[in-house]
């Protein structure tokens, strides 16, 4: 069995989600090859070649893959399909757009967000917002799989794979890049952060996020997250959303402030190693999954907590 892992990268380096998806790909057995598709992405390909367990790296370096458009990348993967038995990618927003297209073009079923490889054709995945585990056995000759990376350990370095150039596939021409607005931040990326501080609808405004949540996050060196209710209310940007319809995270420490704990939010963070909840409602569902809970007014205790942590750092 030969598996093609599609790498998530920034052209210069490999994202941590790729390292974790590699662990899942290796569990299928057989060789694992990595596809790096981008523009001026040689550095990312070289980084992928150093990952333990990678047999070969395919580099598709073309302007068509510069802006994460789903159609050209899906066409490339399908063009490579005759040589592979399985196609694996992290279950990130990018590949949630790409991999269903690959599955449709190959006329197979996609197995989404697996959390365990039972055998090369059998997988476990969460359903019902993580409240049940489904075992899926795929009879398709070619497997298309996305990986919930929060449940897999990251593969380390130690490899020395060859890097080969892959011919670009014909662009379907179904979409074109218009532009992008990039939000830059000195904080860690949400899905790979060790610590996350999240705010909910109780924050009441974008200004309160900036006044209470962000200073605490900065003191802890943390990423900032938000519940869907807070995002829908306009208190936080979409890329901060944690939950079933947002980003799934599993940091070492997750601090939930003013978050009631809707089932959709819990599905995105309940695998965190330590969960701390601050909420004035003692019956809030968030306390059912929290390791530590504080029933208090966030507007009083969060500034005190931020100040106390600041003093510890001096």
Where are these regions (language model features)?
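N-terminal glycine-rich FAD/FM-binding segment characteristic of electron-transfer flavoproteins
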Residues: 1-314
